[in-house]
Amino acid sequence: MQWAAASFVYFACVLPSVGQQTSPAPASAQQSDKPANAAAAAPLRLTLQDALDRARKNSVQFQAALTNAGLARQESRQAFDALLPSVTYNNSAIYTQSAGPVATAATGVPVVFIANNAVHEYISQGNVHEAIDVAAVANFRKVTAAAAVAKWQAEIASRGLVVTVTQGYYGLASAQQKVETAKRNAYEGDRFFKITQDLEQGGEVAHADVVKAELQMRERQRALQEAQLGFLNARLDFAVLIFPTFEDNFEVADDLHAAVPLPTLAEVQERASRDNPDLRAALATVQESNHGVFGARAGYFPSLTLDYFYGIDATTFATHTVFNGQKFSNLGSSIVGTLNIPIWNWGSTQSRVKQAELRRNQAKRELSFAQRRLLAEIRLLYAEAETALNEQEGLSRSAQLAEESLKLVTLRYRNGESTVLEVVDAQNTFALASGAYQDGAVRYRVALANLQTLTGVLTTP
């Protein structure tokens, strides 16, 4: 009993002190977790350049174009290597049945297969091989031109990706602005509905005004929901485009309405004529087809192969052979030259030449079309960008006037100087003008991105 009492007193004294020492730990841990949670919750702020860098890393189509360009470069390297001498080391052992009862393999013993030299034959030789072929040279030039085509096609994909990212980036910024405008319109619709109710209770307006105001309020609420849905769609589409994993904790910089200068038409024409990837790809395709015709015609020419061998080809796997008490070296060398002269192949070479000429003619047509299209696109895309820029000031002014008109018409309605239809019309006009202002800004940015598909330079704020 005394032991139990002493134990009770001990734990009664010790446990509270232990609890006092350990209890502050969770509080400090919670305090240390708060900054981490706050940092984790902070959205990632993206500029247009950030979005472009991420999209280049994660775009499947763009990476596929880069992969094709890399494959084409390797094919060009392989074609060049095929023009150089190659070295191999051949090792083989041939065992052939003898023609008679011979116990051991010896030089001169007849064998069943006359193509073989002895019962036992060991070959261990280094072989230097070189093929001198006009078709191989033409093939190297052809695949080099094909690599240039793939390179410019990758550049086309890169510039097209800029258009896609720009459209998604500023489309998201525009959708966010439209949500704010829709909230403002919903607030104005709700406020006007309350105004009509108050005026109806005072006997100043008819109940028809209240009904019309309620219809307008509900329409503005539906418009807000649609704007929020459009913002969600734009946000998710943009996230899929630029992030390797699903990520929605980000925001874009608010520079949709920042002033961006338009380059002059002369600058666009000069850069487009020098750096247009479509035109460069078409030119490289014509070069590829020209080399294809030359390669097909190379089928009429003879080809030469040279082989140099050094090593052993003996009945024993050794560098020396002893015969009749004399020692002979098995090491030796030989050179083989083969000249292949084409004579007759039932017109296959002529058919390949015809195919290559058809491809070349089509490539020339596509080059001519690319040149005409470039001239037309320079004028068309520049006119689009210039028109969008010129409309910016007017759209901004229209949005400001629509907002001011809404305030004045609502005030006049409260004073009994305007009708409910005028207020509804002012609200609709403000919604349309605000949306047109956002769409006009996106249109100008996308027009600049389309211009960079010709020039390779994206104009930014």
Please give the residue ranges for each predicted region.
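Acidic, low-complexity, intrinsically disordered peripheral segments
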Residues: 9-11, 15-23, 28, 40, ...
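Outer-membrane beta-barrel proteins
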Residues: 76, 85, 131-136, 292-295, ...
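Periplasmic alpha-helical coiled-coil/stalk elements that build and connect Gram-negative outer-membrane
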Residues: 160-273, 384, 388, 429-430, ...
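Amphipathic alpha-helical coiled-coil scaffold segments and their short linker/junction regions
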Residues: 52-56, 110-111, 205, 209, ...
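Bacterial Sec-pathway N-terminal export signals of envelope proteins
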Residues: 21-92, 98, 144, 252-287, ...
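Small/polar, glycine/serine/threonine/aspartate-rich low-complexity segments that form flexible
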Residues: 35-44, 90-132, 251-265, 294, ...
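Amphipathic alpha-helical coiled-coil segments
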Residues: 64-79, 157, 161-180, 191-193, ...
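Bacterial N-terminal signal peptides that target proteins for export
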Residues: 1-11
